[in-house]
Amino acid sequence: MSKIFVFGHQNPDSDAIGSSYGYAYLKRQLGVEAEAVALGTPNEETAFVLDYFSVNAPRVVESARSEGVNQVILTDHNEFQQSISDIKDVEVIEVVDHHRVANFETANPLMMRLEPVGSASSIVYRMFKENNVEIPKDVAGLLLSGLISDTLLLKSPTTHASDPAVAEELARLAGVNLEEYGLAMLKAGTNLSSKSAEELIDIDAKTFELNGNQVRVAQVNTVDISDVLSRQAEIEEAINSSIKSNGYSDFVLMITDILNSNSEILALGSNTDKIEKAFNFVLENNHAFLKGAVSRKKQVVPQLTESFNV
């Protein structure tokens, strides 16, 4: 069998990198020639993780076919618009994910492992256990980091009942204190001062097709929402430019306070009435407070989907 690429979504976060790195390692232990690659450079949080566990960043690829690869495995995503550029020209043979299934179609049967847990890394951990393969320290560290990132250190409503035990076991294997390491890791991802507005709105962004509309939903983590809002003018300029150049109908930016577990929603586009309806708030100067919201997957995208489909 020829080489298989394993990768997470575009604009990869710690779970996209961690789950693909871990699953590629597992596949190699099972006799498959698999390489973890990335669809973008790691963000600052993930760079902290890679440095902490002395792991080289996976190489960034633009397409699979240009690398001579015809089969791919997706982790932490399934929607084609979030995947590799030539996704429709290669065979998807596996998916390991914890998101909704949408805009996904294959010509051949495949293995799909979908679970409503806190992270794709949680699923990969279970697959190691099921195959009786030992998890080395670096893999444990990256899987743990993916789980911490996606659940905000197990505080997000996306946290599954099984996730705390998974986190404790991975922390033990990685040789770290869960709380101390988790907080340091999350804080590493909140250093936004060096980012341009264009970079800021693209750190962790995904496009969703909602009733024929291409809606971009981005999220940045911070310890002070006001610091981000102080740059509102330049952020809005970057958002409007992104809308125009990419054909988005709307752009929603979640500015998430990781210490107090709240978000400010900044929204621009042609359907702001639907966005207001989704969250039962009124945008003032294009933004509004969303108490208790920290999860794009559970507290933003489902609400937008329902509102746009009415």
Swiss-Prot record:
This is Probable manganese-dependent inorganic pyrophosphatase. Binds 2 manganese ions per subunit. GO terms for cellular component: cytoplasm. It comes from Streptococcus thermophilus (strain ATCC BAA-491 / LMD-9). The keyword Manganese applies. InterPro entries: DDH_dom, DHH_sf, DHHA2, DHHA2_dom_sf, Mn-dep_inorganic_PyrPase, Oligoribo/pAp-PDE_c-di-AMP_PDE. Pfam families: DHH, DHHA2. Mn(2+) 2 binds at D15, D76, H98, D150. PANTHER family: BIFUNCTIONAL OLIGORIBONUCLEASE AND PAP PHOSPHATASE NRNA. It catalyses: diphosphate + H2O = 2 phosphate + H(+). It comes from the Bacteria. Its main location: cytoplasm. The keyword Hydrolase applies. Belongs to the PPase class C family. Mn(2+) 1 binds at H9, D13, D76.
